[in-house]
């Protein structure tokens, strides 16, 4: 197969990401982390104190100050923090880095739609276990042989949050597999 045909085949299998509805009227979309309120006075004060150069020059590529602040807040080591250009960037890197086995990765059938896009783009086989009748993840479906697991917590778009014991059960049954819990909306 020629490189051109190979590329065309890869492009054909990738479904483009379709963002959520973009209403024209003035609507605050909570599902995309929009906020109806202005920044807190403390946040506004920080922005007001920034120098012009801090906005127009490329930021610190190591994100040192941010990593330190996050590590302090989360009470973890700085080496346990990874910073990217938004959660989509971080997740894309996770797919490329961790999901490279011939075994299929697992993610729910109703979930963040970009997981399927990345899996197709990076040619990662996947299986999507169905949610139960109450739109919850069935943890036992994630106990089988797999090439890794990813799911959001809370799940998108169901907004159902799974407690630590649920996640620990999945981890116990996947000691030799990568399990990624996507918490992009955990504070939402």
Show the residue positions of the predicted features.
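Conserved core of the PLP fold type I
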Residues: 55-175, 180, 185-188
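N-terminal "arm"/small-domain region of PLP-dependent enzymes with the aminotransferase-like
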Residues: 1-57, 145
